[in-house]
Design a protein with these regions (language model features):
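Structural/interface elements that position substrates and couple domains in central-metabolism enzymes
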Residues: 1-343
Length: 343
């Protein structure tokens, strides 16, 4: 006998940056086929406030013939899994829970408490839990956007961003973030779910959208800095890393794709041992290398600092540079010098 059904599917955006709920709706349809009296459906996908009750519940009712909060119930408990993070795993990260009635909310909370060692936080409503999840990623997106904007400004002021941040970080309440590419299926996507809902309510989420605009402009900024250094001469460029974050094989919404487009007049190659090249080539027509041994490049762009790169970056990275070549350090990994430019 199944009491709980958990739905956790991707919630991407479309080409117009609007929520694409197809997978969520399809999953709800499938679940409705097996829905029984008293079942509790828990959604974990990131959505805008109100989505579970406004979109998913009507689908469940329509295709099951059952009535919400009479024959079946719903809850929302957003996933907080951090890919590539070996410290913060499912059981040691606090889980936000919620339910469509007080009794159901307590049952859902009890269910997650049985596996989450860190404990749970029972939100007063499904909409509250939905909003909490989406702003977690919006806050991070905006914080990185601020640092990215400052990095672009400091570039014009001929200041080293890392040194400025290090000095500012000596204050006890300064929040530490680094500039960089913001991709992936969470931070660069979730803000558009809330802005969609905001605009529907005739509210202009200008700060959230401004942060997205800033972060989306980073690939072009980086490409322009590289092209300026090369005097727009057609060059051979290696990008180290393709995934959207360190130590993770996931390349969804990788901003390296945007970066390669901005560098299209050059010979651009990508090396990332964590990526399944055959899988990537199905979606992208990019030049991936299985090995960089004995290869020389005019520019090496350090885009993702996987642990597997550590030894190479420490001992061999310059072996792959031509005599007058340089490194563009997106991740502020190196100390800048004549051959290393930091973002």
């Amino acid at each position: 006998k199944t009491d709980f059904i958990i739905i956790a599917v991707p919630t991407p955006i479309d080409k117009k940056n609007k929520p694409n709920l197809r997978l969520l709706i399809d999953a709800s349809k499938e679940v409705s086929k097996i829905l029984k009296e008293g079942n509790i459906i828990i959604y974990e996908s990131t959505v805008y406030p109100g989505c579970t009750e406004e979109v998913c519940v009507p689908v469940l009712e329509k295709f099951s013939g059952l009535k919400f909060n009479k024959n079946f119930y719903c809850g929302y408990s957003p996933e907080r899994i951090n890919p590539g993070d070996q410290k913060r795993k499912l059981s040691n990260v606090i889980k936000v829970t919620s339910g469509s009635t007080k009794l159901i909310a307590r049952k859902i909370d009890k269910l997650y408490k049985s596996i989450i060692k860190a404990g749970t936080h029972l939100a007063p409503s499904i909409r509250t839990a939905e909003a909490a999840k989406v702003i977690e990623n919006i806050q991070r997106d905006l914080n990185i956007a601020l640092i990215n904007e400052l990095a672009m400004l400091f570039d014009r002021l001929n200041l080293n961003t890392s040194e400025v941040l290090k000095a500012a970080g000596t204050k006890w309440n300064f929040h530490s973030y680094k500039p960089g590419l913001v991709g992936g299926h969470c931070i660069s996507v979730d803000p558009y779910y809330l802005t969609y809902k905001a605009i529907k309510k005739k509210f202009n989420p200008q700060m959230i959208l401004s942060g997205r605009k800033t972060n989306n402009s980073v690939p072009k900024f980086i490409a322009n800095k590289i092209k300026d250094r090369l005097n727009n001469k057609r060059s051979k460029i290696l990008i180290l890393g393709f995934t959207f974050k360190e130590n993770c094989p996931d390349f969804r919404n990788s901003k390296i794709v945007d970066l390669t487009k901005e560098l299209k007049n050059n010979k651009v190659y990508i090396y990332d041992p964590l990526v399944n090249i055959n899988e990537v080539k199905i979606k992208y027509k990019l030049n991936f290398l299985k090995s960089i041994t004995n290869k020389k490049f005019d520019v090496i762009i350090l885009a993702v600092t996987h642990d597997v790169f550590r030894s190479y970056l420490k001992n061999k990275v310059f072996d792959n540079l031509k005599v007058d070549g340089f490194i563009y350090d997106v991740k502020s990994y190196f100390k800048p010098n004549g051959r290393i430019i930091s973002f």
